[in-house]
Amino acid sequence: MALLNITSPHAQGANRTSRLMLLVVYATIPGMFTMTWFFGPGVLVNVLLASISCMLFEALAIKARQRPVGFYLRDFSALVTGVLIGVSLPPYCPWWLLISGSFIAIILAKQLYGGMGFNPFNPAMVAYALLLVSFPVEMTQWAQPKPLWVDGQLPGLMDTLAKVFSGAPIDGYSGATALDIIKQNKGLVLGDLYQQQPLLAEGRWASAGWEWVNIAFLFGGLYLLYKKVYTWHAPVSMLLALALMAALFYDSGSSSSSGSPLFHLLTGATMLGAFFIVTDPVSSTVSTKGRVIYGALIGMLVYVIRTWGSSYPDGVAFAVLLMNFAAPFIDYYTTPRTYGHKKPRRATDSTPRNGH
């Protein structure tokens, strides 16, 4: 007989988890549809395929462990992982890339550690990082952001399905992201670079399309803060640290500049990472002070990887995984002592008690 393995209180623990997970899914909707507006229906195909794959792999793993499948699937944690994988991978990427990422996230990064609540690393970011290292070409084929109302600029639904399931190239639609452009043109003054690159020139504050995607995920994150799904400490400290690092090394656009603070805040996966990845309660820190340190170090690492790191343009996934590894260490030194417990007395301390 399949037995339930949940901690007390048993009355509403599972229901609360499923409610919070659904709130996270709802909060991704503004960013998801903004991405669809600028990148086409490939975003929705990604999310749908990754979500179904994650739920299927979750069900298979739970069944193999002889647990009640329906009960554990209804916590919707696998659905959240699928949505995050779907919006993290490039639209129009091959179908097998999404299924491989779902397998890595659910089976290797989650269920092998014991399931939800036991995984030390964020499953979606483990999948993203392994796919990026293993398939760098497929993982960097981002479509150029063009509004859907511009005819012929993005593939339609049928073309999208053909590209996803046949592996047809998207050379006519793909190109470098804003972070790629900045990183690969270090010798140019930013003013000249903005004039030469339409992706930068068409942007209002950062880069065309991506700035609105980040604003949409920001609104989703603020909604989660309003609903008290998590506290402000980790996301805000990450954004402040990233902006501070960018401000320290920004010199008004010389050839050695790597973008303004606003550019880094509204480009790439910044807001998605801050409000939907860094805030993962399982793989992050638990103390308030620890969350501030955890988020700030992630923000600093994101800037370091973006600016001086390897050929990978965005550093959110690698920064998060590095700090997942360091989270227990941070908690060890920042978690307050239990009320009533004091530091152990030294053996040499012979202070008399009660006057004796």
Swiss-Prot record:
<keyword id="KW-0597">Phosphoprotein</keyword>
<keyword id="KW-1278">Translocase</keyword>
<dbReference type="InterPro" id="IPR011303">
    <property type="entry name" value="RnfD_bac"/>
</dbReference>
<dbReference type="GO" id="GO:0005886">
    <property type="term" value="C:plasma membrane"/>
</dbReference>
<feature type="transmembrane region" description="Helical">
    <location>
        <begin position="20"/>
        <end position="40"/>
    </location>
</feature>
<feature type="transmembrane region" description="Helical">
    <location>
        <begin position="315"/>
        <end position="335"/>
    </location>
</feature>
<keyword id="KW-0997">Cell inner membrane</keyword>
<feature type="modified residue" description="FMN phosphoryl threonine">
    <location>
        <position position="177"/>
    </location>
</feature>
<keyword id="KW-0249">Electron transport</keyword>
<keyword id="KW-1133">Transmembrane helix</keyword>
<keyword id="KW-0472">Membrane</keyword>
<feature type="transmembrane region" description="Helical">
    <location>
        <begin position="205"/>
        <end position="225"/>
    </location>
</feature>
<feature type="transmembrane region" description="Helical">
    <location>
        <begin position="229"/>
        <end position="249"/>
    </location>
</feature>
<dbReference type="GO" id="GO:0055085">
    <property type="term" value="P:transmembrane transport"/>
</dbReference>
<feature type="transmembrane region" description="Helical">
    <location>
        <begin position="117"/>
        <end position="137"/>
    </location>
</feature>
<dbReference type="GO" id="GO:0022900">
    <property type="term" value="P:electron transport chain"/>
</dbReference>
<keyword id="KW-0812">Transmembrane</keyword>
<dbReference type="InterPro" id="IPR004338">
    <property type="entry name" value="NqrB/RnfD"/>
</dbReference>
<keyword id="KW-1003">Cell membrane</keyword>
<keyword id="KW-0288">FMN</keyword>
<comment type="similarity">
    <text>Belongs to the NqrB/RnfD family.</text>
</comment>
<feature type="transmembrane region" description="Helical">
    <location>
        <begin position="68"/>
        <end position="88"/>
    </location>
</feature>
<feature type="transmembrane region" description="Helical">
    <location>
        <begin position="259"/>
        <end position="279"/>
    </location>
</feature>
<comment type="subunit">
    <text>The complex is composed of six subunits: RnfA, RnfB, RnfC, RnfD, RnfE and RnfG.</text>
</comment>
<keyword id="KW-0285">Flavoprotein</keyword>
<feature type="transmembrane region" description="Helical">
    <location>
        <begin position="42"/>
        <end position="62"/>
    </location>
</feature>
<dbReference type="Pfam" id="PF03116">
    <property type="entry name" value="NQR2_RnfD_RnfE"/>
</dbReference>
<comment type="function">
    <text>Part of a membrane-bound complex that couples electron transfer with translocation of ions across the membrane.</text>
</comment>
<keyword id="KW-0813">Transport</keyword>
<protein>
    <recommendedName>
        <fullName>Ion-translocating oxidoreductase complex subunit D</fullName>
        <ecNumber>7.-.-.-</ecNumber>
    </recommendedName>
</protein>
<feature type="transmembrane region" description="Helical">
    <location>
        <begin position="292"/>
        <end position="312"/>
    </location>
</feature>
